[in-house]
C-alpha cells in the first residue's frame, strides 16, 4: 500500500477544518441570537406615536439579534406602495410603540424581519389585546424567528422557524406555488413563480390547523435542499388566519433586498398587509 503523502494529509486536514468551520458557522447563524448579545428594551412612550389618519400602518423592524441588510429596502418599498394606496405608513424600531395609546391608532403592525427579544411583558400584553380587539399583524421573513419565550406569539403564527437553506446554496432560486383560493395576498399572482431567497423550514406545517389559510408553498424539488433537510413535502411559506377580532398574515419571503423591487413579491406582501389591516 502506497504511503499517504504529507501534501495529501494537509489537504485532508484542510477539508476537515473547512467542514467543521462551516458547521460551527451554521450553528451560530441558526441561533440568530448570540450569548454576548443583550436585548435592548424601549420603555418610554414616544410623544409622537399616534397616527394622524385612520388608514395607518406601523412597520416595526427592531433587531436585538441578526440584522437583515434588506430591512431598509423593505421599509422604503412598503412606505412607497402604501402611500400610493392612500395609507399613512410609519416605520419605527422603538418597542415602546407597543402601548395601547399608540397601537390603537394603527390598522395593522408589520413585523419586518425583527430578531431577538424586543418587547417587555407589558408590551406583549398590549399587542395581544390589540390583535384580539381587531388590530392586524403582518409578519415578514424573520418575524417567525423572534420572541421565542412569548408563547402567545408562537400560537398566533401557528409554527416557528426551524432552519433555512445554507451552504453551498444559501440563497437558491426556487419555484413558489400559489395555493388555490381567494385572498388579497395571492390575487393576481401566477400559479407558479420563481424567486431567489433564504428559504425557511418550520417546525411543522400549519396546513390543517383550524382557521389557517395556506397562501404559498415552495416546491422543494426545485432547489437544492441538502442539510438541513427541508420539510420533506408540504412546505407552506405564507399563510393567514383570523384571531379574536383581528387578523394575522405571515410570509417567509423577504431575506433579500431584491424582494422589495420584485413586482410579484410586492403584490403578495402588500396584499397581505392590506388584508391584515382590513384595507383591501
For each feature predicted by the language model, list its residue ranges.
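Catalytic beta-strand/loop cores that center a nucleophilic Ser/Cys/Thr
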Residues: 42, 167-244
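Helical hinge/lid and interdomain linker segments adjacent to catalytic or ligand-binding clefts
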Residues: 11, 59, 69-147
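Solvent-exposed loop/turn segments at secondary-structure junctions
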Residues: 63-66, 95-98, 114-118, 137, ...
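Extracellular ligand-binding/catalytic regions of CAZymes and related secreted enzymes
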Residues: 11, 26-52, 80-84, 221-224, ...
Amino acid at each position: 500500500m502506497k504511503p499517504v503523502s504529507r501534501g495529501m494529509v494537509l489537504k485532508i486536514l484542510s477539508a476537515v477544518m473547512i467542514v467543521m468551520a462551516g458547521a460551527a458557522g451554521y450553528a451560530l447563524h441558526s441561533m440568530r441570537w448570540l450569548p454576548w448579545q443583550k436585548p435592548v428594551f424601549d420603555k418610554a412612550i414616544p410623544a409622537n406615536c399616534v397616527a394622524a389618519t385612520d388608514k395607518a400602518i406601523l412597520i416595526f423592524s427592531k433587531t436585538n439579534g441578526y440584522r437583515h441588510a434588506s430591512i431598509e429596502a423593505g421599509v422604503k418599498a412598503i412606505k412607497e406602495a402604501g402611500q400610493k394606496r392612500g395609507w399613512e405608513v410609519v416605520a419605527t424600531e422603538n418597542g415602546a410603540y407597543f402601548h395601547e395609546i399608540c397601537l390603537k391608532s394603527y390598522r395593522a403592525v408589520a413585523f419586518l424581519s425583527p430578531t431577538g427579544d424586543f418587547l417587555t411583558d407589558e408590551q406583549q400584553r398590549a399587542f395581544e389585546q390589540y390583535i384580539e380587539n381587531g388590530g392586524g399583524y403582518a409578519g415578514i421573513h424573520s418575524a417567525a424567528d423572534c420572541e421565542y419565550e412569548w408563547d402567545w406569539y408562537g400560537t398566533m403564527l401557528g409554527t416557528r422557524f426551524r432552519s433555512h437553506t445554507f451552504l453551498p446554496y444559501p440563497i437558491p432560486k426556487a419555484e413558489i406555488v400559489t395555493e388555490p383560493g381567494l385572498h388579497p395576498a395571492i390575487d393576481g399572482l401566477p400559479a407558479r413563480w420563481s424567486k431567489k431567497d433564504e428559504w425557511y423550514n418550520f417546525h411543522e406545517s400549519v396546513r390543517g390547523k383550524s382557521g389557517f389559510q395556506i397562501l404559498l408553498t415552495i416546491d422543494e424539488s426545485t432547489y437544492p435542499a441538502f442539510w438541513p433537510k427541508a420539510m420533506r413535502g408540504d412546505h407552506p411559506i405564507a399563510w393567514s388566519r383570523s384571531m379574536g377580532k383581528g387578523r394575522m398574515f405571515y410570509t417567509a419571503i423577504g431575506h433579500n433586498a431584491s424582494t422589495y423591487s420584485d413586482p410579484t413579491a410586492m403584490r403578495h406582501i402588500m396584499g397581505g398587509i392590506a388584508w391584515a389591516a382590513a384595507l383591501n
